Amino acid sequence: LVGAKVKVKNETTGFFAEYTTDDKGYIKFVSDRKRDYSLSSHYHSHKDGTGSFNTKIDKDITKVDLTFEMEMIKKGDVFVINDIYFDYNKATLRIESTQELDKLAAFLLENLNIKVELSAHTDSRGSSKDNLNLSQKRAQSCVDYLIQKGVPKANIVAKGYGEGKLVNKCSDGVECTEEEHQANRRTEIKVLKVN
């Protein structure tokens, strides 16, 4: 893709640089020998791509061909947003949650043609009614934050599902590990419309 943003990170030193693909979809950069590199690509209205390579051979490398498969984002796509945290039984965003929401805000501001539902889910512990109310408040808290960052209100809707869409067997009365319950406590983005 022409004009895609590619971030190249030297995993040994932590140094990274950002490039834009040329008219043939390529980037050029100078790498160090005997290093591991990770790459991530970003292009509006597409899912991000990732890859890696290393230069741990003794010969000079003049060219490395890596291909990223970057699918168009389409209606119905669902993405889990990691690292969104709330205190127990609260709907106030914790400060460490803002980094992921800032990334989402940047994406939505870059893609004003996309309308999304931000949904919050709980585990099955507690009453269904309380979980539904709590999840709606948490979803709204995230949406309010995104609107404060400039995301148009018309492009995002909050929806709490409570314990209504569990991703595993951990319903009422089923013994589960904390990790299994955690899998159900999640925040997701669903694409409602792409113009």
Question: In which residue ranges do the predicted regions lie?
Answer:
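Periplasmic peptidoglycan-binding/tethering modules of Gram-negative envelope proteins
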Residues: 1-115, 178, 192-195
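Periplasmic OmpA-like peptidoglycan-binding domain that tethers envelope proteins to the cell wall
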Residues: 119-195
